[in-house]
Regions:
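Outer-membrane beta-barrel biogenesis signature
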Residues: 8, 22-81
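Membrane translocator/pore-forming domains, dominated by Gram-negative outer-membrane beta-barrels
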Residues: 1-24, 32, 77-305
Length: 305
């Protein structure tokens, strides 16, 4: 959950940078989108049609205000802001390997942001609310229900030539409920700070306009102490200590952005290929059983954070 909160925020904001550069000649830089991520090959084939329908209806229902970030005189529009929003829904199953029980994950989020151009530099603020439901298929009906409220500050700095340095810092408040058969057995709160930076070289490589990039991301999360009351059937009460841990990754890849001309129409093709190396270590945490006061150490694998 901790890493997913960081990923959802940074991924959405960095896509905003890409969108701004693809549309920098437009006078209207407002944007409102809905994104679906489905880890199911059958359902994934239907998502594009649904996304287009939702985005079309959303666009038609909104009355845009002109707020240009592209002008010959950058000081003229120094007070103008472009506003944007992004909704995302993700669901799928992960972690099914050998004797490891799979997890069904459903993530929903909405982000609202505003940005403007100051002396050819982009500055913006964005707020995201996210809800993560994680169901563990272990026969007990275990589930985690997490709420995340995140404030982001982001910016883009043009470097020499056609290179850009995009960065963001964010702070989150987390609320996590542990449930067994829809009964809350534990409540935990957390806070989180994180930063992400990406370097892009926009010199054109090949006719598909390939753009190499490198990214570094780091976060610190602190979870409060909490008591797991279990159920009447388990008759077990465990007190978990406060937990502070770091997460991070380094990645690199290629983006492509190409326009295909078809008679009187144009088709914009863009995407990216990325390799991510996870720097997060396994985390040890301790808890005590209320009845015998025995301290137990448990290791959380990095892919579970």
């Amino acid at each position: 959950i901790a890493k997913n909160v960081i990923y959802q925020n940074s991924n959405t904001i960095f896509k905003r940078f890409d969108w701004l550069r693809r549309n920098e000649e437009k006078t209207n830089l407002n944007s409102h989108n809905i994104k679906l991520n489905i880890n199911n090959p059958i359902l994934a084939s239907l998502k594009n049609k649904l996304e287009n329908s939702l985005n079309s209806n959303l666009t038609n229902s909104l009355e845009y205000t002109q707020a240009s970030l592209k002008d010959k005189n950058p000081f003229k529009n120094i007070r103008n802001w472009s506003h944007w929003s992004h909704g995302d829904i993700s669901f799928g199953r992960v972690g099914e390997k050998g004797f490891v029980k799979p997890k069904d994950i459903r993530t929903r989020g909405i982000m609202f942001g505003a940005d403007k151009l100051i002396n050819n530099k982009i500055f913006g603020l964005a707020f995201r609310y996210g809800n993560d439901d994680v169901k563990i298929d272990n026969g007990t009906g275990s589930k985690l229900d997490a709420q995340a409220y995140t404030l982001n500050m982001y910016g883009s700095l043009p470097l020499d030539g056609k290179s850009n340095l995009n960065s963001l810092i964010g702070a989150s408040f987390l609320s996590i409920d542990q449930l067994i058969k829809n009964t809350i057995t534990g409540e935990r709160y957390g806070r989180q700070i994180f930063a992400s930076i990406i370097y892009e070289n926009e010199n054109e490589y090949t006719r598909h306009n390939l753009t190499p990039f490198g990214k570094f991301e780091i976060g610190i999360t602190q979870l409060s102490e909490y008591t797991d009351f279990g159920t009447s059937a388990t008759n077990s009460v465990d007190v978990h200590e406060r937990l502070t841990f770091k997460t991070g990754n380094i990645s690199g890849g290629l983006k492509f952005d190409d326009i295909l001309y078809l008679d009187e129409k144009t088709l914009s093709r863009n995407g990216f290929v990325e390799y991510i190396f996870d720097l997060t270590p396994d985390i040890d945490h301790f808890y005590k059983n209320y009845h015998d006061n025995t301290s137990v150490r448990k290791t959380i694998k990095k892919h579970s954070l």
